[in-house]
Amino acid sequence: MESVIFSINGEIIQVNKEIITASPYNFFKRIQDHHLKDEAIILNGINYHAFESLLDYIRWKKINITINNVEMILVAAIIIDVPPVVDLCVKTMIHNINSTNCIRMFNFSKRYGIKKLYNASMSEIINNITAVTSDPEFGKLSKDELTTILSHENVNVNHEDVTAMILLKWIHKNPNDVDIINILHPKFMTNTMRNAISLLGLTISKSTKPVTRNGIKHNIVVIKNSDYISTITHYSPRTEYWTIVGNTDRQFYNANVLHNCLYIIGGMINNRHVYSVSRVDLETKKWKTVTNMSSLKSEVSTCVNDGKLYVIGGLEFSISTGVAEYLKHGTSKWIRLPNLITPRYSGASVFVNDDIYVMGGVYTTYEKYVVLNDVECFTKNRWIKKSPMPRHHSIVYAVEYDGDIYVITGITHETRNYLYKYIVKEDKWIELYMYFNHVGKMFVCSCGDYILIIADAKYEYYPKSNTWNLFDMSTRNIEYYDMFTKDETPKCNVTHKSLPSFLSNCEKQFLQ
């Protein structure tokens, strides 16, 4: 019986000529006459056992593919050009892909030009980018490859500080490609992370490129009232979907987002004041009642900073209170601060450089009702007076932007809305052009290079150019509206000495 001789790494395999002749695959068609010669056909780059498996498939249409042998069989099937086995191997690899092997499969797919495996491994890397940074192969990704991965719209990062940590870990292995840092968008980063990068001697150039990472864009949480029951909905920029998180039956409450949880603070239920605080995780939708505040109150002012929820002032029955207290996320004990100099409710509070600024609102007792314009600052564990606002305002909305405070006032006793800028370093107020007039609730938040205002429509105010954009939006029955980014960077005063500790803490929090 005639046979064809193959030599693989010095080992000989004799194959019946009839098997070669009957094979529909091009490789064997090309060598059908080669068996007449005495010399063996040398096969390079193929595993001996993998070639045996291919011969079994050609003969019996059966092949044993496992996660342990799939790569060597796939290589052989590509070289010998056996498409059905290639497909089986690729399906096996895709089925078994995970965060620990996706970079290796990504590199394998590039080496052999396997598009389906490339797409699947890329998808796995994108979905598990923080986990794959622990893979030794991560540092071997090229600059262009990592740029492509981190520029994907669905890359699984929830904050630009996380992107920064991924880049810093890669740069540690690739110090000649530090300019990859320029894919960052500084306006989405915390001041702490920007300072850390500066201390490392890295400079992020100003970019006009569009933001492609959906995960670093702002999430939105909205509470809308309907027949005394308010529905909480959450919008995720990664999924581009709105989901219902739950309901609340409170009125006159305040709310704030901290560590991906929505806190609902104080208010009234069935016309009775409450001092409880509820918390709902916006991802898991699980509710938890946290420790009660020190007293029953509504119309409090709230703000968050460094993982803490601050509750300031409020209305205790008919009397304004000066109580200020905070609760650290994940703990159960409220910590009291010194009382405000002037008790108030319905004012605004905002953090600037770890100092609390409180402004406006109403001071009331059983005999008095005073609309305030005064401003207090909590710094160095005490409240001090600052320059008052230009006018008295009972309803105030405030936001920090670029180290200063921007204030929009509501309408009660006033005839129109006002927009002010408080220059913190100069302790000085200036009045700015106000684009619209609106009677009713408003919601104000800082969004990178603009300030978002939800009133009778959606407005964007750009402080640097003092310009406005208007967008149609149904705002009926909205009780609360906020935009936020997920994951919070450990807050500290980063110095050359504390930098290694800070980066280590960030790596533990973000990349493990």
UniProtKB/Swiss-Prot annotation:
Belongs to the poxviruses Kelch family. It comes from the Viruses. InterPro entries: BACK, BTB/POZ_dom, Kelch-typ_b-propeller, Kelch_1, SKP1/BTB/POZ_sf. Residues 2-67 form the BTB domain. The lineage of its organism: Viruses, Varidnaviria, Bamfordvirae, Nucleocytoviricota, Pokkesviricetes. Kelch repeats lie at residues 216-261, 262-307, 309-354, 356-403, 405-449, 452-498. Residues 102-176 form the BACK domain. Pfam families: BACK (PF07707), BTB (PF00651), Kelch_1 (PF01344). It comes from Vaccinia virus (strain Western Reserve). Keywords: Early protein, Kelch repeat, Repeat. Coiled coil: none annotated. SUPFAM superfamilies: Kelch motif, POZ domain. This is Kelch repeat protein C2.
